[in-house]
Amino acid sequence: MKEIKGDYMINKLGWKIGGEQGEGLESTAEIFSTVVNTLGYHMYSTRDFASRIKGGHSNSKICISEEKINVIDYKTDILIAFDQATLDSYIPELDENSIIIADAKIKPEISEEIKGLVAIFPITDLAKEIAHPIIKNIITLGICSALLDIDSKLFYDMIESKFSSKGEEIVNTNIQAFDKGREIMSEFMAENNINDKYYLKKLNPTHKNMWLIGNHAAGLGALVAGCRLYAGYPITPATEIMEYLFDKLPMVNGAYIQTEDEIAALGVAIGANFAGVRAMTATSGPGISLMTEFLGMAAMAEQPVVIVDVQRGGPSSGLPTKTEQSDIFHAVYGGTGDASRIVLAPISVEDCFYTMIDAFNMAEKYQTPVIVLMDLQLGMNKETVPSFDFNRVQIDRGNLLKQEEITEEDIIYFKRYTTDVLVSNRTIPGQKGGIHNANSYEHSVVGLPSEVKRNTVRQKEKRANKIESALVERPFVLNEYNDEKDILLVGVNSTYGVLNKAAKQLKEQGMKIDTMQIRQIYPVAQAVRDTFDKYRKIYIVEHNHNKQLRTVIASKYHNSEKIASLLKYDGDIYYTHQLVEQLLEEEK
């Protein structure tokens, strides 16, 4: 047996569990991370799983740190293997201080390339002796509790909370399994002189962090923004938004509708907004493709609506459980005619909450569809976030008139689409003096179909110009690490952390790199272009093959030849070393 070298008291830790999908690995990771959150640590997670219910390899990785973390470290300190693929696939992530815990049931073949200490336990056999093979996950938690010196009571409380509804016997059986895991690891640690090398001390945080996925943060943001109707159809990786709002909307007298398809979902949401109710839908690539015609209708009829697109690998059914950022073209340009709309993009789980409030406000302020683009990594994976600041929340319903504000009550039709201003006044059904037509045809100022050339030009220019004038409060986040401006790394969604970590690493090598994370993809903010002017070279980092974000931004920038791309489109997240290697190659 190898002895762990040196004092390895943890201030950050990479924990990974792998095995066959459908065997409860995700539940193990969830219980483990929830307990670690009570210790006061920051965490950031990722999952790799197949588009099936059971079978095939999957894994979950959680990065733990005393400081704020928003990037997955490539290095793995603790690797738990319930299949041979876990032992074979992640060798490059291990070093001499790593510990590998394997289930004897898989008859593990340990490669000579594996660094670190290997512990093989009869986890499944012990689970069978206690109750059932599935309880191996609780034994695993006991193993981790001993290795990291986490108080057993924290896990007991979690087990009690999770299984109390199934009776005292089930609770006691799970506690027995946990204790067995703790016992066998304690014996192993004593035999191998591990002592306190991996202990996670309890911190004393000034506040407790939430442990959330982006989809849930977005759902809560929608509720706080005043969303009172959700219409949708289930699709990976956006379904958690639908499930969250299904549970929460009744608490605020809201309504939830699971429609027959995505087309109907957007139609219902548009109709609710027309009636004055803030409403939304959420989907992914295949779903937003079906919604395209209704997107055009909402743009033509100048109806507010919010659509969340949690991007996955495409095209078509593509890679439902892999991350990608390849719906940017569709979000910005998708549809017939000149159907401009606003496209926002949160940069973190915390920002998913605030971006949804921005989206609902902008949808009504500019009377247009607003698409909130997320990616699978941001939507489905967890991050520790501070409690949301509800004092920051402001509701802006734009030019939606109250009854007393409608001055010409005796007219037959209300001039809903006047071209005298970019954003005209808006009324809802039932208001006296507010009658107008809203449909998919080009129209006059009162909404009646019109093919008059002069009117057509004015209406098209009004719709386009109001979108071009749209600006969210923070269109991007700029991190400046150098006084001298040389290279700017630009990203969107979940790449925020990896861009900043790469910039800091390369600064140590003498490179002068700042980062910009885009929050408003379209329209391209003038401030983005002004910032670009300060740098010698701009690299846009994105998860797609067609350089979609670069194309959108470059089309609005006068010096586009200095914009280059760094791309990754294999379905996996960016790791810092990969981005660093790409950038160094480009800068040769």
Task: State each model region's role.
Residues 81, 101-103, 122, 283, ...:
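Short beta-strand segments
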Residues 46, 154-155, 167-176, 188-200, ...:
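Flexible, glycine/charged-enriched surface loops at secondary-structure junctions
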Residues 160-163, 187-207, 222-227, 246-252, ...:
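Gly-rich Lys/Arg/Thr-decorated short loops/hinges at beta-loop-alpha junctions or inter-strand turns
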Residues 9-91, 236-331, 342-363, 508:
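Thiamine diphosphate
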